[in-house]
Amino acid sequence: MIKKYGIVAIVGKPNVGKSTLINAIMKKKVSIISNKPQTTRNAVKEIYEDDESAIIFTDTPGFHEPSNKLDLFLNHEIEISYKEANVILFVTTMDKELDANDFEIINLIKEANKENIILVISKAEMAKNQDQIDERIHFLKKHIAFKDVVQISALHVINIDKLINTIKNYLHKDVVTDYFRQKAEKEDKFVITEIIREQCLLNLNHEVPHGVGVEIDESKYNQEANHWIIKASIIIEKNSHKPIIIGQNGTMIKKISMGARKQLHEIYDCHISLTIFVKVENNWRDNNNIIKSLGYKIKK
């Protein structure tokens, strides 16, 4: 079937609403949302499809200075997203001032030499007035050429359809095959690990910030009973982090498990049995083998 087709990279500094935006577009939870930076690790790819178009949306990790091999992976994911994209959505949010991180992203867009750039004003409802938004747009236009500007509120699902229709103006017509759909489809394993990791980020505050990985040990689905049994492990870097994650009398690990189980039930509409263990892998973020085993690709 011939449709308007393209790859769209959603870029911007951490916590400007990229994950909320892609979730609003897809109308389901595919990218973890937290008020802490670096909550999106993999470049999340999801396919949006309607009668006239098929679009792969890529929600990129936030760019940051690398301090270990995992950080290098994260920045490599961003580079790939920019190169593959037919359209780039540069997201800026009205509840935060522009800073050096925004201009780092702008420089990356310029280096990628992309023409189809759409400025997305996120959390437009947080602006004092329209003049404040217009001032932001005018300032950014001095630094990079945007083809279009769309004001949205992803959380309240305002102007999401307008954004999708704007994107369609810059797509090309192509044959959309089953291979295309399979390539874009997210694996259940990724969704499970991201949701568990989100619960860690939400509940642990800054005690065990980002030295947390998640591994699926077992996944069995009983179709007749509509029952999914999942066993997973939270990977940490230090023994001293273990009692923090487990909590007194297991209260924290129980809280993480219950939060993840509730979200998985809402997404998959089945009974979820989730058991979470804690494993210590010293300095795992600098261990290529462990990074690969957790589903991350290493830049060669």
Curated annotation (Swiss-Prot):
Annotated compartments: Cytoplasm; Cell membrane
CDD domains assigned: Era, KH-II_Era
Record domain Era-type G: where: 4-173
Organism (species): Ureaplasma parvum serovar 3 (strain ATCC 700970)
Residue pairs linked by disulfide bridges in the UniProt entry: none
Region (G2): 38-42
GO cellular component assignments: cytosol; plasma membrane
Start and end residues of each stretch annotated as G5: 152-154
Domain KH type-2: start-end pairs: 204-282
Residues covered by region (G4): 122-125
Gene (name only): era
Pfam families assigned: KH_2 (PF07650), MMR_HSR1 (PF01926)
InterPro entries named among the record's database cross-references: G_ERA_dom, GTP-bd, GTPase_Era-like, KH_dom-like_a/b, KH_dom_type_2, KH_sf_prok-type, P-loop_NTPase, Small_GTP-bd
Name by which UniProt lists this protein: GTPase Era
Assembly and binders: Monomer.
Organism domain of life: Bacteria
Record GO biological process: ribosomal small subunit assembly
Region annotation (G3) ranges: 59-62
NCBIfam families, A to Z: era, PRK00089.1, small_GTP
Lineage of source species: Bacteria, Bacillati, Mycoplasmatota, Mycoplasmoidales, Mycoplasmoidaceae
Function according to Swiss-Prot or TrEMBL: An essential GTPase that binds both GDP and GTP, with rapid nucleotide exchange. Plays a role in 16S rRNA processing and 30S ribosomal subunit biogenesis and possibly also in cell cycle regulation and energy metabolism.
